[in-house]
Amino acid sequence: MDLRQIRDVYIDDGLDFQNATARTCRDVVLTLISASRMADHVTVKGGVVMQQISGDRRRATRDIDLDFVRYPMTDEGIRAFIRTLCPADVDVRLEIVGPIDDLKHQGYHGKRVHLRVTDSTGTSMETKLDLGVHDKLPLEQLELWFDTALQDEGVALMANSKEQVCAEKLRSLMRIGAASTRFKDVFDVYYLLCREGVDADALDRAMRVLVYDADDMRENSPADAYARLSRVLNDRRFLRNLSNARNNWLGANVDKVVTGILRHFG
């Protein structure tokens, strides 16, 4: 395995240096998970799932978001997880760099791991793992094939459904409101709802678990969600930030994005 060669392929494909490095590390980590017994204890989420679903290099992501399933979220558990991914016969090493950080924001509790990936030639690259716990058992995890430069056919791992991804991004937007800085999430939601398409019943189930029936949310119905999202998405300052080309990975018309999202709840 030659990390530099893999990164160069992604650069030739149009990614900048940082995103090519992140994608190379992503490929290594997902491939190692799929080949290990930890594949049954991990589900992939966040930007990595969005990147795969969209197949669009503009939807870049720097971190790797994972949830543990029936596995302890402790520092020792995390270190054992990383060790398990690298048996002696694998020609790449993973090393945790520095302390494991606690992540706590808006009711979310997780861990951040700074990871160094080193190949047999001594080339090293660094990435971040953001780890959580899959505790919403009614939300079924689905098998998703991830493209990777290390396997021609890709690798299969459990992942959040696109309906869960959509509902979690909407939950965050409603919870934080117009003060949210996660503008890319708005375009993710629009892509899932209006371009990729979602199963209406599956989205309703995900919204019910994550929003309507959640003790820490005020929105109890699609009508409540519509009212809250309408206030947030039509806030003038929020709209200005949405219009920033850096946030708009789709290059979509912002008014069309807002209208498209609200149409699903109105």
Language-model region placement:
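Structured mid-to-C-terminal alpha-helical surface segments
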Residues: M1-V42, Q52-A60, I64-G266
